[in-house]
Amino acid sequence: MSSISIFGFFGLATGRRVASQKPGASTKSYHCFYTTALQCSSGVALPAELRVYSPFNDSVLADNTVAFVVAKAHFPRNESVLLEASHIVPLPGDPSSDEYDNNLPDSPYPFIIGLGSVPSRFETLSDGVSKAFNVVSSEFVRDGLKTSSLQCIFDGSRPRWSRTPTPNVNSTIQYFGSFAGVTQDGIPRVTLDSIILNVGHNEPSTAATAPTPIKKWKFAAFAAPMYVHVPFSPDPSSLIYSQRW
């Protein structure tokens, strides 16, 4: 039970489209590869290579295109990060224009969400209040399962972490945050925004269904009310008419 996913805005360059054919397969598949960088709040940028499936008649993006990316990730020690993208949404505009950068979202540091195990106890960082612990996670990247080590940080300057317990050794956690930098050992650091401790197995449950609201806009700021009622009954007192907010 393990995973690593990254999402955020990335600059893409040196795109190339590559064909591959698995042993025994009768057809070729195509992927686009891009050079990119994973920017950290400390000012460090980790070099990365992004791969995404390329459909028929697809073309590569222009150099310096900024796109919103959702990808699985692998962090080999002291090597380029490998990103396996499932979604790439290029932002509108001309990347060669001087005005292109002015219209981009001010969100340069990608977010990470993962599930992994904690192999050792936490350590207190040099500020005397922040705590750090390593997490080991695996993900299917570049046609194989690959394992990565990350260091998660409880930022001591944020009061919300003052009473949060650190994970137990060998426990499984879910973590969410943004990239802060790299340790001296070359392990990426993640400043946590959220953590779930002692993640365990739960039996699957059936999700409740509800009518789909009418779509009016591509992005909605307000949700349309949803009405749910039971079928007609001879007894009026048994009718239910509820409004969910």
Regions found by a protein language model. Name each.
Residues 1-245:
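OB-fold and OB-like single-stranded nucleic-acid-recognition modules
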